[in-house]
């Protein structure tokens, strides 16, 4: 039985068990796969169309989830990231190009787009758009050709791990899309290498992230590519207190600004089935962040930094997501969504804020090493 030593109020003694995180992630992932049937490509594909913040302001944005086998990092020996379950929403086996394209075209046809509308398109692959083993090159190229033929796509947004951000792949893409804006979003999660590698099990370093960003910046300068970078920042990994989560997210935003990342997107933790974070949560060793913590982060960043910063509201107000109280959960979620478009601070008061402040202000006081509980993770 693997055990973790837990200090009072989420202050953890991690020596001796941090090395087990990767093994635990792999074990939980394997068990999750055994309990459920892989999805069909048709079940994986999805799309929606609404207003979103683009580099030219608020505009119509088409979101398309492409059917893929799943993230190569999660399907490999690493077991993937401790908070992510996207691979559970994939086929877990290769998909032929024709099937991918058929489903892409089906979803594209569901959203009639007026010729006068200038739109942004976000392509999600539940992994890395730039990894040819997840999304075959011929499928990728045909998708991009199709979008260019629409005549009114001004931005294309994709996601990728940094190791797939290669000059060869970007050359191939810009040969098709010309001067269209192309943003690569990378899940940096945190600027703290120890947190990213040992608590999130991300599998790449800050240097790897910097190299990907620098490559894109260099290609923009030398080849004129209309390239942008975005960093996803994860709010409150396991083995991190509420106060530490706030400080680390803000510090990560400052770091991204210092290396000229173009945009930020904060992703507060939600509890997904078949993940390490769910195991901690079920054992009483983890709780998603307060919504107040998320607001503190986004307000500070919008005050300090001159760069677009978004705050994801997935799971807000639910048992498995960021939560304040029943009085303010819904109001704050709606305010955050609206303020993502205006990039303004969120001003709101509720009685539950006192409880949040007490937890934050007493963070150091609660870091006692006297009473140690043993929490079995298996």
Q: Where are these predicted regions, by residue range?
A:
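Auxiliary Fe-S-binding modules of radical SAM enzymes
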Residues: 5, 10-11, 18-34, 43, ...
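Canonical Radical SAM [4Fe-4S] cluster-binding loop centered on the CxxxCxxC motif
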Residues: 44, 53-102
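Core AdoMet radical
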Residues: 85-107, 111-136, 150-166, 180-209, ...
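Acidic-and-aromatic substrate-binding clefts and catalytic sites of carbohydrate-active enzymes
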Residues: 92, 96, 163-168, 238-243, ...
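Well-ordered, non-membrane alpha-helical segments in soluble/globular domains
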Residues: 94-109, 135-146, 204-212, 245-253, ...
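Acidic (Asp/Glu)-rich catalytic clusters
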Residues: 111-113, 147-148, 172-181, 217-220, ...
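Distinct, well-ordered alpha-helical segments
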Residues: 133-141, 166-175, 243
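Conserved C-terminal portion of the radical SAM core fold
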Residues: 207-275, 294-313
